[in-house]
Amino acid sequence: MALLHSGRALPGIAAAFHPGLAAAASARASSWWTHVEMGPPDPILGVTEAFKRDTNSKKMNLGVGAYRDDNGKPYVLPSVRKAEAQIAAKNLDKEYLPIGGLAEFCKASAELALGENSEVLKSGRFVTVQTISGTGALRIGASFLQRFFKFSRDVFLPKPSWGNHTPIFRDAGMQLQGYRYYDPKTCGFDFTGAVEDISKIPEQSVLLLHACAHNPTGVDPRPEQWKEIATVVKKRNLFAFFDMAYQGFASGDGDKDAWAVRHFIEQGINVCLCQSYAKNMGLYGERVGAFTMVCKDADEAKRVESQLKILIRPMYSNPPLNGARIAAAILNTPDLRKQWLQEVKGMADRIIGMRTQLVSNLKKEGSTHNWQHITDQIGMFCFTGLKPEQVERLIKEFSIYMTKDGRISVAGVTSSNVGYLAHAIHQVTK
């Protein structure tokens, strides 16, 4: 009994003499997370789960953001297989990468984005760090803004934008605003609305721009429109934050897809840039990306680099090794790079071809609607203009799965199912 009177009674002994204490202790131990609510399912992953449960042999999954070949199968680029074989033959170690990543990968990524003859590269007034794909690049950039962009907390996103943009910037401590971008009447770019809204954005705010193949709409500004946007950005002294997840994958030409980024820099606008190799190299699960900041001079770039490393260290310490080695091998080996560029163009051309076939099949079905926006849009995704109730019918009656906003992944369309898709769309829109 001495233990009970010492004021330091063992919990088990005290509980034996006081059943109420046992119940209270049990309640305390089991109720840490009773306040945690069930979160909503991811809308795109939810589409995939519903697709998997469907037993219809004609079912189509047009929600997934990954390339598929014309048989509807995942595609590993032959250049990636070659790079993997070359790397394996070297019997390399698995040591940690530096905080900023694989140096030869970072250098090659900057060259791919900005152009090999870029003044920025020659002067050294930039920093590139390897990131955990495009999402990681965005988060590193957002966290850097939160810590060092002293002018504003507002980030202006196009309406609509990739669904992950909002939580990435919000969770980093930034505030989200919007500007007009997509015109549902034309299923095209609302150029007038975009320029009007950007012209009214408070000076020294952050403007997020999709460099090419806008997700989710597939609607991109034309070069002359980009020029006017750049003029407004420069006049309003806005910070241009580019997300470039589809270089080469949009048009089949990497230089063409990077045109907007390069034009802004040529106009004296110091941008930051997020890159991903998920789509254009098919390295989805390898998580290969880069974040680049264009600075005033080389000294500023070194200071920014030091702070980016300080941000990265407590997040994940070092980026993954394998995917960066693959990408670096492809970008830095002339024959592999040439092969890769041809393969990227092949993927882009297949998607462009599927757009054309879909419109052709809709006409064959007798549709009198104007479907030109399907071929006008670019990249993996197409904003069909379908209404939520029409999407619901496609899912229930035809087992064609997509997100409620009518966005489809054209990469999921093949020459064997494009006719079925056109028939179904015609049935719900006639």
From Swiss-Prot:
UniProt name for this protein: Aspartate aminotransferase, mitochondrial
Keyword Lipid metabolism attached: no
Positions where Phosphoserine occurs in the chain: S143
GO MF entries: kynurenine-oxoglutarate transaminase activity; L-aspartate:2-oxoglutarate aminotransferase activity; pyridoxal phosphate binding
GO biological process: 2-oxoglutarate metabolic process; aspartate biosynthetic process; aspartate catabolic process; aspartate metabolic process; fatty acid transport; glutamate catabolic process to aspartate; glutamate metabolic process; malate-aspartate shuttle
Residue(s) carrying N6-acetyllysine: 59, 73, 82, 90, 107, 122, 159, 185, 234, 279, 296, 302, 309, 338, 345, 363-364, 387, 396, 404
Subcellular location: Mitochondrion matrix; Cell membrane
Cofactor: pyridoxal 5'-phosphate
Transit peptide: 1-29
Species the sequence originates in: Pongo abelii
Keyword tags: Acetylation, Aminotransferase, Cell membrane, Lipid transport, Membrane, Methylation, Mitochondrion, Nitration, Phosphoprotein, Pyridoxal phosphate, Transferase, Transit peptide, Transport
Catalysed reaction, written as an equation: L-aspartate + 2-oxoglutarate = oxaloacetate + L-glutamate; L-kynurenine + 2-oxoglutarate = kynurenate + L-glutamate + H2O
UniProt cross-references to Pfam families, sorted A to Z: Aminotran_1_2 (PF00155)
InterPro entries for this protein: Aminotransferase_I/II_large, Asp_trans, NHTrfase_class1_PyrdxlP-BS, PyrdxlP-dep_Trfase, PyrdxlP-dep_Trfase_major, PyrdxlP-dep_Trfase_small
